[in-house]
A protein has these predicted regions:
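Catalytic phosphate/metal-binding cores of nucleic-acid and nucleotide-processing enzymes, i.e., regions
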Residues: 1-72, 76-92
């Protein structure tokens, strides 16, 4: 499962380009689950810097499909956690 998170301090938001992409390609607004394939496709297509809003750079974390997860954040920098494990975005 792929999950979109904010990978810088500031907080999750989408750029106008990302909003337009989601509306034009899928006819939806940005209020979708972070694991929604359409949001994931948007970030993969545009890139995290373009898809992220003014104080946001977006990344994709991939976790096993059977994991119950949630997003935690510190000053807007997000990561995905399970009760006893966590995954962080790795810059490539």
């Amino acid at each position: 499962m792929k999950i979109v998170v904010n990978v810088c301090y500031g907080g999750f938001s989408l750029s106008q380009e990302a909003e337009d992409f989601l509306m034009e390609k899928y006819g939806i607004n940005s209020r979708v689950d972070r694991s929604d394939y359409r949001l994931v496709n948007c970030v993969e297509t545009l890139g995290g810097s373009v898809a992220g809003g003014k104080f946001s750079v977006l990344g994709i974390i991939e976790i096993p499909d059977d994991v119950e997860w949630e997003i935690e954040e510190y000053d807007g920098y997000e990561h995905v956690v399970e009760k006893h494990r966590s995954w962080h975005y790795e810059r490539k």
